[in-house]
């Protein structure tokens, strides 16, 4: 399923690989807000795809204000995908639309799906759910409907070994599942963020199950080149 690979590539790059494993777990600390780990400001970075179909390709990743309400933002990964983000009244970071350019589709979440709680502690182990509809990007034709479940499973302070050297930050384990008629897409994501700088590490894989028993598993990765 083409959109499965597109979602995974974008999810990994959303949380930005610096190509290397987290090496040490430090003492846990949860007294931190999402705005400290994912600063909302206009920026652009360059990434290299390090795993998957387009391995070696350079792709820009940019975050910019989407206009209208001050809390509405758009995160774009080259010509692969774009995600529409906003804050709710409690300060959580929400996703209400995902554009998948390569698969000529876009997904609308109803209601908007919380992907990060305002503070780390309140979001752990809580399953967030929303309905979704997938449309053709050019014609607007409805292609699929389903339900998504998103959970932040664990978080720990960690030290990441990267080409830029050792970086201290926070490591998140995330579970994301999309249930559709006759199919299920399950994504396991690892996310590393540095305070006041945003994502510095990421890893992910997806497993697509069709008709309950046909399965396909793939991975994707991308690494920071420049800011």
Task: Enumerate the language-model features and the residues they cover.
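Bacterial N-terminal signal peptides that target proteins for export
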Residues: 1-10
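Short alpha-helix capping/helix-loop boundary micro-motifs
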Residues: 111-114
